[in-house]
C-alpha cells in the first residue's frame, strides 16, 4: 500500500515537472505579412529571440487581416504592425490624427483586446508620392502643395496609383480635397503596386504612389514629395505582442524595443533594397543588421 502511494506521488510529481517545463518552454510564434519589409522584420525578431534562448517559430507571408485575426485568436503571438492600418482597418477610426495620437489610440483600443503595442519605431511606411530627382529642377515639385498648384495650372502630369489608392478614404479622392486640386482622368493611371515604381523609373508617368520605406526609392533615385498638410495617416511600424505572451516572457519588451529604436525610414529603405535590389537573402540581411547594431 505504501509503495503504491509512493508510486502515485512520484507519478504526479513527474507529471507536474513535465507540465511546468512545457509551460516554461512554450514556443513564441512570430508572424509576418507578405512583403519584403515584413519578411525582414519577422526574421530579425526570430533571430533575436533565438539569441536569447527563447523558443520561437515563424509564420510569414500572411495577408494583413489574416495575421491580425491569427494574433487575436492566439495562433500568432507577435508581429510588427502599422499604426495607420490598426487605426483605420482594424479599429475603424476615420478621424485624422497626428502620429502620436494614432499610436496612443491604437495602443488603448488594442489593449482592451489583450494586445500590447511596444515602443514605436521611426520607420513610417505611409503612402507617398514620388518624382524622379532628375526632373525636380525642371518641374519645381518638392511638396504636395507644389503638385496641387501644377494641376490647378493645367500642367499635364501623369500620375500612377493602385486601384486601392484611387478608391480608399486616405487615397486620391480625399487627397484632392485636402490640397484643392483635381487629376484629370486621362492623366491618372491605375496599376499594380510594384508597377508604379517601374512606370516612374521608365518615364511612363511623372508622379507615382510609393510606400515611404520601399528600397526602390533610393535605388531608382526618386524624391518623395513632402506631405506639407499631413494628409496621409501615420504608418509607424511597431512590435505588437499578446499580453499573455509578454507576461510569460517579460524580457521581450526590452529585446524588441532595442530593435525598434534602430529603425527609421532610411534604414528600412536600405534593408529593403538589400533584398529587392541586391538580391541578398532575408536571413543574411537580418543577421548583418543585428550584428552591426550589437543586437546579437
Regions found by a protein language model. Name each.
Residues 154-227:
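Ligand-binding pocket segment of bilobal, Venus flytrap-like solute-binding proteins
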Residues 37, 166-181, 250-296:
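An extracytoplasmic/periplasmic, membrane-proximal ligand-sensing/linker region
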Residues 27-43, 60-64, 164-167:
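Extracytoplasmic "Venus flytrap"
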Residues 36-55, 71, 173-177:
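Short, polar/charged alpha-helical segment
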Residues 60-64, 74-87, 102, 193, ...:
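Beta->alpha turn/N-cap motifs
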Residues 90-118, 204, 216-230:
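Ligand-binding "clamshell"
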Residues 101-158, 261-265:
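A conserved helix-loop-strand patch within extracytoplasmic ligand-binding domains
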Residues 127-137, 236-249:
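A bilobed periplasmic-binding-protein/Venus flytrap-type ligand-binding module shared by bacterial periplasmic
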